[in-house]
Amino acid sequence: MRKIFIPILSLSLIFSCMSDDQYDDLNKDPKNPTQVTEDVLFTSATKSLFDQMSSTNVNNNVFKLFAQYFTQTTYIDESNYDLNGRTITDSHWTEMYSNVLFDLNDSKEKVIANAELTSEEKEGRLAQIEVLSIYTWQQLVDTFGDIPYTEALKIEEFSLPAYDDAETVIYPDLIDRIDAVIANFDSGEGFGSVGDRIYGGDMTAWKKFANSLKLRLGIRLTDINPTLARSTVESAVASGVFTSNADNALLNYQSATPNTNPLWVDLVESGRQDFVAANTIVDIMNDLDDPRRPFYFRENVGPDTYVGGDYGDSNSYTTNSQLGDLLHEATFAGVLIDYSEVSFYLAEAAERTYAVGGTATEFYNNGITASIEYWGGETTDITNYLADPEVDYASASGTWREKIGTQFWLAMYNRGFEGWTVWRKYDYPVMNIAVESENPVPLRYTYPVDEQNLNVDNWDAASAAIGGDSQTTKLFWDIM
């Protein structure tokens, strides 16, 4: 909730952790009290998380470029993977720590201290807070690698927090944490329709969300820790993951600022024409005659004609396919996890003979179907597409990694972080080399400049531990 943009990490953490009394001393205004409740903090953290994951503002988020769904028209630094000019890694780090994790932590402390809440209300609210916290921690790990974790939210004790090992400390702990709260959704009473903007207080839906997040955690580990991966995935499925698009973890944005989808701000309100569809995704979809093209892209070049801009080059806004009309709508929903994503995870699990209650073909088809339906395709579109020899799971070329990876990546359009992560995990589809820099797709964000300058010793140790603070350093789970 608190938009205190201080470029130095340690200071931003200090100010984010200040008590309400301290805020009163700084900002005392009897007509505008600064005391905030746990539900307001939870709602604010929720929106901050969705906004950061949805935005395509290159000052904050370049994941849609990293996934090569979009490419740029005039200013092409970011599509050539230069993130230093705008301190993008610092912005993402600060947003996720300060405006998401600290607000969630503050909300947690207020729930615990609120004597008016019943034990069931505390249990449910704390479970909701925990799920969004775990989601955010995983996102940070999957962006940077090792990060400050055990010391990160204890600023009075640790002004310069140490980094934790993502493989041996953070991921196992996140799995333990989500295991500890899943059962609480059965009896707990969460934030209701006012505070909970995702499910409006539906705890059954939250339990599916938690299990689907647990599934994601487990699938990330399949190549590096197959034993933990199997047990995590199978227990998540047994407890109940998403089974339709009705389960999707969405934030329905509103038509008026400041509650519109950030995409609308970037693409419409700004009046700018910074992005077109990248040739990477357009070429693949054209080859497959993909029915999602009229939803993903505009037909501004011509009827049923789709042209992608060369990735990493300066591209014409008028002669390349523009981003689809849905992405220009102020109310277009943001997504944290959806049924299509869950289905592709289950397809991989089935290929690995995990006990998940279906075949790889069934889950693969479910993932494609869910994506086409979500974007507005018809039943005939789905039937014809699945029958295409290059889409049909039995006949499509390549290994299961290529089949699942390519269709999974296509389904994550507009969810740049997951699209980038799918490519890192499965190594498909084949990405383009950026035209101007001739650099390949980065494998991680480098650590923020402020960490390098201010938290030097801990940054040095973390950099050495992961194999170097470089865009080409693989994350611990990316071993293929």
What are these regions (language model features)?
Residues 17-68, 74-77, 84-87, 98, ...:
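Membrane-proximal, proline-rich intrinsically disordered regions
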Residues 35-39, 73-379, 394-401, 407:
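Structured, solvent-exposed acidic/aromatic patches
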Residues 1-4:
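Positively charged n-region of N-terminal signal peptides that target proteins for export
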Residues 372, 376-480:
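C-terminal functional modules
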Residues 21-24, 323-324, 381-387:
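Short acidic (Asp/Glu) and glycine-rich catalytic loops that position anionic groups and cofactors
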Residues 6-10:
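Sec-dependent N-terminal signal peptides
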